[in-house]
Amino acid sequence: MAMPSPVVVPASGKHSATVIMLHGLGDQGSSWAPVASQMGLSHCKFIFPSAATRPVSINMGAPCPAWADIKGLSPDSPDDEEGAKQAIEYVHKLIADEVAAGIPPSRVVVGGFSQGAAISCLSAMTHKEALGGCFLLSGWLMMRQKVPSMLSPSFLSDKVPVLHCHGTNDMIVPFLFGQVSSQAMEQMGANIDFKPYPGMAHESSPQELSDLQAFLKKCIPEAPPAPIPSDPSGLSVKELKGILKERGVDSSDCFEKSDLLAKVKSLL
């Protein structure tokens, strides 16, 4: 199934980490794009994929954007395993693209809202190499009975951090379903932090986004800048400007390479 192009928000600073966030049922990636600026992580690139449109059972069979079919939203509801596996493969491909571009798996965090959270969780748990983290906002664990046999050994051995946020007044994905999912992951050995939000419905909140920001800062902190060569005179103008930018040093008053070089040498 052809997937729409994701919304990509480039890092505003030196790119050293990537966050992939999946939307919920009936939504699209652009709806969550403002989260990128709200997180205030200049070193992070954010990718907001959009699901293809398909018939959805819980939507009376009407087509809408969905990562897989949803037959129900209770702990006993059957899952669309084939649809979920296709979505996981897509997320793994997005991760592979980031790795090919030079971002290690340990610097990639996946997460999402509602059904997007469910898919991103499985994507992190089954990825061959340990990711930097995973977050679920109002989500749940799909295929609970089969996940133990699908788990990547590195997910447990590297203690990949998982943040699971859920509102107590969620009437779409019931709070109890979130609790059951979190407990199931914990029993599997997952390094999970379950956070309840009193009074919150099937939505996000400023406090939840603040908690997500703190989680991302902990999982994928800004990488320290590369060391400055002892003799930077052989560097190009672009490289000298890059060194200054990484360290927050203004170079707008540098009109010659010698000016840049003098500023860089002052940092040694």
Located regions from the model:
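Acidic, Ser/Thr-rich intrinsically disordered and amphipathic helical segments
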Residues: 31, 90, 119, 177-180, ...
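The feature captures the conserved acid-bearing segment of alpha/beta-hydrolase catalytic domains
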Residues: 9-12, 139-222
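Serine-hydrolase catalytic machinery in alpha/beta-hydrolase-like enzymes
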Residues: 2-107
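Primarily recognizes the serine-hydrolase "nucleophile elbow" in alpha/beta-hydrolase
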Residues: 99-157
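The conserved beta1-alpha1 loop
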Residues: 22-24, 112, 138, 166-167
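Basic helix-extension-helix modules of the SAP/HeH family
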Residues: 225-268
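Intrinsic disorder
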Residues: 16, 23-26, 78-85, 203-206, ...
